[in-house]
A protein has these predicted regions:
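A generic structural signal for well-ordered coil/turn residues at beta-strand boundaries
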Residues: 3, 206, 233, 291, ...
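Glycine-rich, charge-decorated loop segments at or immediately adjacent to ligand/cofactor-binding or catalytic sites
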Residues: 182-189, 386-395, 496
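Short beta-alpha connecting loops at secondary-structure transitions
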Residues: 57-65, 243-247, 352, 373-379, ...
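Active-site proximal loops enriched in glycine and acidic residues that flank catalytic Cys/His/Asp
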Residues: 11, 41, 214, 241, ...
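Cysteine-nucleophile active-site neighborhood
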Residues: 17-20, 24-28, 32, 343-438, ...
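C-terminal and late-domain segments of enzyme folds
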Residues: 434, 438, 442-532
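Flexible phosphate-sensing "switch/lid" loops adjacent to ATP/NTP-binding sites
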Residues: 1-325, 333-349, 356-357, 363-370, ...
């Protein structure tokens, strides 16, 4: 396609309506029609990236292959489209301002007074068009975080207004709003949507398509009313009702011809149907599963979004193993030797979750010991893997005071130590070992059986590592180091071959699992959990 087309996705009425899912679904449908698509997220907060944000506030921090700490929506983009995103796919207000201020300090603006318009808006526009200009995508979908009406969003909306004016038919705005249901009146109310669109119109943007989020179906009359009062075409009002799974959304959008409407409005031919065969096959597998696999997630964060990618990876793996997933959250802060049997005895497998800091760490040791001694399939990820190693040192190697330098700087047996290159680091943000690194697998391991190859590449986010001083002792006692980074000799994977499935990875495999290509380790873990 000669020119890149830009689709902007904004949200109104309330946050957390699922702009990321709608953006991903649009991308999925366009990709299924043969177009080359990418998605980017603009977050209006002033942090440079979400790397230092509290998971309680913001959910998980996603990591791209090039080592950028990003918004969890990038996980949705990758899972829905099977693409790899980079630092350029997630921009924050903090990065926009930093870039402009750096240019001002260099003298790039030749003494001009730096203002929101044009300097900040020009920088936003440059970033919007960056991926399209560099990689010649057919479509760049840009999700704007936050809600229309927020002060923080105004520079982004002004940038969209300008881009729509500059690009003409090559730019389109999809506005997602919420239609509440009043139980007392037994009625859906469209007034908040009308006000949200008026707010958007007041900054000079007329949405081309409206997606209405609701718990209930909207009838044709209601959709016609919204079209009339919001000044959009009738066929450009689409409903997005709650679904049993987010992976149903692209199908529902296609049934309402959202993809056709977009192509028509952007002056592109509408030929044939999108190829959604593999997607529909996945959904068919998901809905036809009758048996259930119960997995415990042992971690300290109670917000489910803090483990979003792990949950999605487990769900995908369960589907491909013809099982439904039932997840039980176990708060590691309250897990003790006294109650661990009650919490974990009836689950089929356990994931010891990643995290940072002292809180809840002892509960993870308790879980690792219980699953090791009861031969229960166990998957430790990042800090979870480190907990497995520490527990093994304490209870098998006999180092009762073994620990990580992160938890106890004075531990005499630092089986987990700070990485050499991290010792001089003072800043917290963006300074960890981040992004994709090589790993070579032992061909005699369960991990190799899962991957079916010796060389893999996985994404990391950590400062601490397995201490190779203790490696020989671990191996002799039965915990094998089966995945090694060829450059640094860093231990990436540990496993106990004598147990059914007891594997810990320093990397985050959940970032590489997609709907149509589930991660081999999650597939293998679920397979072990369901085998009696």
């Amino acid at each position: 396609m000669a020119e890149t087309k830009y689709i902007f996705v904004t949200g109104g009425v309330a946050s957390s309506l699922g702009k990321g899912i709608i953006s991903s679904s649009i991308g999925n449908l366009l990709q299924a029609r043969g177009y080359n698509v990418t998605i980017q997220k603009f977050d209006p907060y002033i942090n440079i990236d979400p790397g230092t944000l509290n998971p309680y506030e913001h959910g998980e921090c996603y990591v791209t292959v090039d080592g950028h700490e990003a918004d969890l929506d990038l996980g949705h983009y990758e899972r829905f489209l099977g693409i790899q995103t980079t630092k350029a796919n997630n921009i924050t207000t903090g990065r926009i301002y930093k870039s402009v201020i750096d240019k001002e300090r260099r003298g790039d603006y030749l003494g001009k007074t730096i203002q929101i318009i044009p300097h900040i808006t020009d920088e936003i526009k440059r970033n919007v068009k960056l991926l399209g200009n560099k990689y010649k995508f057919d479509f760049v979908i840009t999700e704007i975080g936050g809600t229309v009406g927020d002060i923080e969003s105004l520079p982004y909306l002004e940038s969209i207004r300008q881009l729509k004016w500059e690009l003409g038919r090559n730019a389109l705005c999809v506005h997602l709003t919420y239609v509440p249901y009043l139980a007392a009146a037994k009625e859906l109310k469209t007034k908040p949507t009308q006000h949200s669109v008026k707010e958007l119109q007041s900054v000079g943007i007329q949405p081309d398509i409206l997606v209405l989020r609701s718990e209930h179906e909207l009838n044709a009359n209601l959709r016609k009313k919204v079209a009339l009062f919001c000044n959009v075409d009738e066929n450009a009002v689409v409903q997005s009702v709650d679904m049993p799974t987010i992976y149903e959304v692209p199908i529902r959008m296609h049934e309402q011809e959202l993809d056709k409407t977009i192509l028509t409005k952007m002056g592109l031919p509408v030929e044939g149907e999108p190829n959604l065969d593999s997607w529909k096959e996945f959904l068919k597998l998901r809905y036809s599963a009758t048996k259930e696999v119960k997995i415990a997630l042992v971690g300290k964060y109670e917000l489910q979004d803090a483990y979003k990618s792990i949950l999605e990876s487990l769900s995908q793996a369960a589907t491909y193993n013809h099982y439904k997933l039932n997840v039980e959250f176990v708060n590691s802060e309250y897990l003790t030797d006294e109650n661990v049997d009650e919490q974990l005895a009836n689950v089929d497998g356990v994931v010891i979750c990643p995290g940072f800091g002292q809180r809840g760490i002892e509960g993870k040791f308790v879980a690792a010991k219980y699953t090791r001694t009861h031969n229960k399939p166990t998957f430790g990820i990042c800090l979870g893997m480190q907990c497995m190693a520490i527990e093994f040192a304490r209870n098998v190697l006999g180092y009762a005071d073994a620990n990580s330098r992160e938890m106890d700087e004075k531990t005499p047996h630092n089986v987990i130590d700070i990485m050499e290159e991290q010792k001089s680091v003072t800043n917290m943000g963006g300074t960890m070992r981040l992004g994709a690194y090589e790993c070579v697998l032992d061909q005699q391991s369960k991990t190799f059986e899962a991957y079916h190859k010796t060389h893999i590449q996985e994404r990391h986010r950590h400062r601490y590592e397995f201490n190779n001083v203790y490696k020989a002792e671990y191996e002799k006692a039965g915990m094998k180091c089966v995945g090694i980074n060829p450059e640094s000799d860093l231990v990436e994977i540990v496993e106990i071959p004598g147990l059914k499935w007891y594997i810990g990875t320093q990397f985050h495999p959940e970032y590489s699992s997609t709907v149509l290509n589930p991660h081999p380790l999650f597939l293998s873990f679920i397979k072990a959990a369901i085998s009696k």
